[in-house]
Structures are given as structure tokens and as C-alpha cells.
Amino acid sequence: MKYTNYDIIRRPVITEKSMGAMNEKKYTFIVDIRANKSMIKRAIEDVFGVTVETVNTSRYKGKKKRVGVHIGKRPDYKKAIVKLTEESKTIEFFEGIQ
């Protein structure tokens, strides 16, 4: 199956820690679990029009949740921390968030 750039990037991560990393031009996203670093780099560069220096990824297991007697599990996910080059502009989506 061929992925589009919008299939690879699921959503941004908006936390206090990720907002602090923005000063170093590091942005955090939840990405498709099957995406590799080169796919993530290409998707970020195409969608936001920036130049990516490095991509660091981490895979997480979904938490087990229980409602009454029923036991379920949240889905597994992958988080990508993308560092932009010094010459690159900032990602406009994050500019208004502080």
C-alpha cells in the first residue's frame, strides 16, 4: 500500500516538554507505526516546506484499559522527534502555541 504524506503524519504532540524542545527547533509528532525515518523526513519536508536535519523515533505499547469487567487495549503508536536545520524556517502550525 502506498502512503501519502498525510497518512504518515497523524498529529502533533502538544505537551510542556515538546513545547520546550521547540526552542532547539525540535518538533514532535505521532506518526504511522509502519513509517520509517526516511518516510517521516520526506513527509515533514513536503507538508511543511522545511529542511529536516535528523529524525528520532520511539515505539510505544498501548495501555491496557478496563471498563467494568471488559478489558481492552489502546492502540500502539510511534512518536517522531524531528530536528530542523538552523537555516530552516519554523513550522507555522506551532507558532501560535506557547
Curated annotation (Swiss-Prot):
Key words, A-Z: Ribonucleoprotein, Ribosomal protein, RNA-binding, rRNA-binding
InterPro entries tied to this protein: Nucleotide-bd_a/b_plait_sf, Ribosomal_uL23-like, Ribosomal_uL23/eL15/eS24_sf, Ribosomal_uL23_CS
Domain of life where this protein originates: Bacteria
GO biological process: translation
Keyword Secreted among record annotations: no
GO MF annotations in UniProt: rRNA binding; structural constituent of ribosome
Pfam families: Ribosomal_L23 (PF00276)
CC annotations in GO: ribonucleoprotein complex; ribosome
Subunit structure: Part of the 50S ribosomal subunit. Contacts protein L29, and trigger factor when it is bound to the ribosome.
Assigned protein family: Belongs to the universal ribosomal protein uL23 family.
Function of the protein: One of the early assembly proteins it binds 23S rRNA. One of the proteins that surrounds the polypeptide exit tunnel on the outside of the ribosome. Forms the main docking site for trigger factor binding to the ribosome.
NCBIfam families in alphabetical order: PRK05738.2-4
PANTHER family for the chain: 60S RIBOSOMAL PROTEIN L23A
Protein name, per record: Large ribosomal subunit protein uL23
Taxonomic lineage: Bacteria, Bacillati, Bacillota, Clostridia, Eubacteriales
